[in-house]
Amino acid sequence: SANANVAGQRLNVTTNASNGFTVTVQADQTLTSSNNDTIDVFDDGDGAAAPKAWEQPTGTFGSVNTYGHWGLTSDDDINGSEFGSALFVGNFSTSSRAVFHHSGPANGSTDNIGSTTVAYAAAVTAFQEAGDDYTATLTYVATPVF
């Protein structure tokens, strides 16, 4: 199916750091099966750094990077709301990507100050290599700014 599946995580940060914090995320790999098949990063494996609207994988036979992809979005107002209304990036598996930031103390519950949602979308085409064990480990790091 070429329809995206979406899963989200709620991030909560409580800090008394006067200049706030930044939360980054990094995947240890792209989604990889036990057969070493992969679901590449958004968009068609190009690792989009600039947020853009979700696009389905193109599914070009013989071009494995186009068989499926996954990307991330954040509802935080980070960098002037760079993720806008569900814009996605794919550059979070080879380096860390900032997904949440606030410039002052945070209470762990107020939207865009102490709490936000990060979501991951994944879609595959009929050419994606079969497997039910595609995995990647996401590591979040919250860094205070003093």
Language model features with spans:
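Signature of Gram-negative chaperone-usher
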Residues: 1-146
